[in-house]
């Protein structure tokens, strides 16, 4: 579960960064061809290798039933609370990936190669967290473990904000604070996802889809809000205050 949810957390983060990096070496049409080929391969593998987990009841697909299940999921407070908690916890990382090229390359004068290396600790924090949860934590769903992850996240956000206020021209504080926050989020994300998925009797596929709908919609909106805050409402400090508020929420 920890590995799967870490993939869910990393995929929207690594994808845009990998695409931006590959555009330095490949034509954009070739990139679209690669994406299409990989999507076709994933579709074929799902058709031939996806295990069947639901016993057939001799009924066809009924859109009305699917819609009613989604309505029930959206009316479930645990599902919505979990989806919003996951979305807010992921916001500082997603907005950092979206705006860090502007902050570090355009405004900070960093080379693209150096910029790519600055993202390694951020992704490394999530990967290390998933390894810790999978290998060393016996009961990650215990309240004690959950409360122990929160100070890691808040410390990362405070390092991010305080370091940039004290040393505004040093990129190290942005990267180190975001990396520490990514470590805390990687520890907490699988637990929150599991709580939202299994704390009720609703169909798990519907609940997972509901969580992803909320999270992806929130992600798209948060990137636009963060972009406006950075360019129109105060620059880097205002942007990092937004990350701190999201982490606290």
What are the roles of these predicted feature ranges?
Residues 193-232:
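A late C-terminal transmembrane helix in Major Facilitator Superfamily
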Residues 51-82:
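Juxtamembrane intracellular "pre-TM" segments in multi-pass secondary transporters
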Residues 3-48:
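Helix-loop-helix hairpin linking two adjacent transmembrane segments in secondary transporters
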Residues 4-16, 42, 89, 122, ...:
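Structural signature of transmembrane alpha-helices in multi-pass secondary transporters
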Residues 129-144, 230:
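Helix-to-loop junctions at the C-terminal end of transmembrane segments
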Residues 75-93, 179-180:
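Pair of pore-lining "gating" transmembrane helices in MFS-fold secondary transporters
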Residues 144-190:
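C-terminal transmembrane helical hairpin of 12-TM major facilitator-type secondary transporters
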Residues 11-23, 101, 133, 222-230:
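Small-residue (Gly/Pro/Ala) motifs that create kinks and tight helix-helix packing interfaces
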């Amino acid at each position: 579960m920890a590995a799967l949810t870490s993939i869910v957390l990393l995929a929207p983060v690594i994808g845009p960064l990998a695409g931006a990096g590959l555009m330095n070496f490949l034509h954009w049409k070739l990139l679209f061809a690669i994406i299409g080929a990989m999507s076709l391969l994933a579709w074929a593998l799902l058709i031939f290798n996806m295990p069947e987990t639901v016993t057939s009841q001799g009924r066809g697909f009924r859109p009305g039933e699917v819609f009613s299940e989604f309505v029930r999921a959206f009316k479930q407070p645990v599902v919505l609370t979990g989806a919003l908690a996951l979305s807010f916890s992921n916001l500082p990382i997603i907005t950092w990936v979206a705006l860090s090229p502007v902050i570090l390359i355009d405004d900070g004068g960093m080379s693209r190669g150096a910029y790519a290396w600055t993202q390694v600790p951020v992704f490394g924090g999530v990967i290390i967290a998933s390894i810790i949860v999978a290998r060393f934590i016996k009961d990650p769903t215990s309240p004690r473990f959950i409360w122990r992850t929160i100070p890691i996240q808040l410390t990362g956000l405070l390092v991010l904000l305080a370091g940039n206020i004290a040393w505004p021209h040093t990129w190290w504080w942005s990267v180190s604070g975001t990396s520490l926050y990514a470590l805390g989020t990687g520890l907490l994300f699988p637990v929150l996802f599991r709580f939202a998925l299994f704390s009720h009797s609703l169909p798990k596929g519907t609940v997972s889809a509901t969580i992803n709908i909320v999270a992806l919609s929130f992600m798209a909106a948060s990137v636009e809000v963060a972009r406006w805050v950075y360019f129109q409402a105060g620059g880097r400090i205002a942007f990092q205050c937004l990350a701190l508020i999201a982490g606290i929420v």
